Design a protein with these regions (language model features):
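Short amphipathic alpha-helices in soluble, non-transmembrane regions
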Residues: 20-23, 86-90
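N-terminal beta-strand motif that seeds the catalytic metal site of vicinal oxygen chelate
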Residues: 1-19, 70-75, 126-130
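Vicinal oxygen chelate
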Residues: 37, 87-130
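Short, conserved charged micro-motifs
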Residues: 16, 80-85
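Exposed loop/turn and edge beta-strand positions of beta-sandwich/beta-sheet ligand-binding modules
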Residues: 5, 32, 106
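Core segments of cupin and vicinal oxygen chelate
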Residues: 8-55
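A short, acidic/glycine-rich surface segment
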Residues: 54-60, 130
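Short, flexible turn/loop "capping" segments at secondary-structure junctions
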Residues: 63-68
Length: 130
C-alpha cells in the first residue's frame, strides 16, 4: 500500500512558483533546475515541474490551467482564521480569488489560483457544537 502522495503540477517559472508557495508558509524538499518539491504534510508533497519536464511525463499534453480546471487542490487547516490567512497570503503573492468564501455550517473554505492558474482551496471542517 502506498504511504505517500506526490501531486505533480506544471509551472511556467519555477523560481516565481517557489516564491509564491514560500509566501504561503510552505517548505521545500529538494530542488533541481526543473523541479521543486513543496512539503504539504509528512505524507504529501506537490512536485512543481517546469512545463517541458512535466510534458515529458504527460501522455496527453499539458492542460492550460488558466482555461480549464484540471483538478482542485485542497489544503486542510484547523481554523477559519487560518483559511482566511492562507487565502489572503495567496492573493498578496499574486494569486487570484476563486469564487466567494463558502460557509455552510460544517465547513468554511476560500478558493484561489496560484501563479499558473491551478485552483487551490483552503478548507476548515467545523466541529458541530455539542
Amino acid at each position: 500500500m502506498a504511504t505517500k502522495l506526490f501531486v505533480n503540477l506544471p509551472v511556467k517559472d519555477l523560481g516565481r512558483s517557489k516564491a509564491f508557495f514560500t509566501s504561503l508558509g510552505l517548505d521545500f524538499f529538494g530542488q533541481t533546475d526543473d523541479m521543486a518539491s513543496v512539503i504539504v504534510s509528512e505524507h504529501t508533497q506537490v512536485m512543481l515541474l517546469a512545463e517541458p519536464t512535466f510534458a515529458s511525463y504527460a501522455r496527453n499534453g499539458v492542460a492550460d490551467a488558466a482555461a480549464h480546471t484540471e483538478m482542485i487542490l485542497v489544503l486542510g487547516v484547523e481554523t477559519r482564521e487560518q483559511v482566511d490567512a492562507l487565502a489572503d497570503q495567496a492573493q498578496a503573492a499574486g494569486g487570484e480569488p476563486v469564487g466567494a468564501p463558502r460557509d455552510d455550517g460544517w465547513r468554511y473554505q476560500r478558493g484561489f489560483t496560484d501563479l499558473d492558474g491551478h485552483h487551490w482551496e483552503a478548507l476548515c471542517l467545523i466541529e458541530p457544537a455539542s
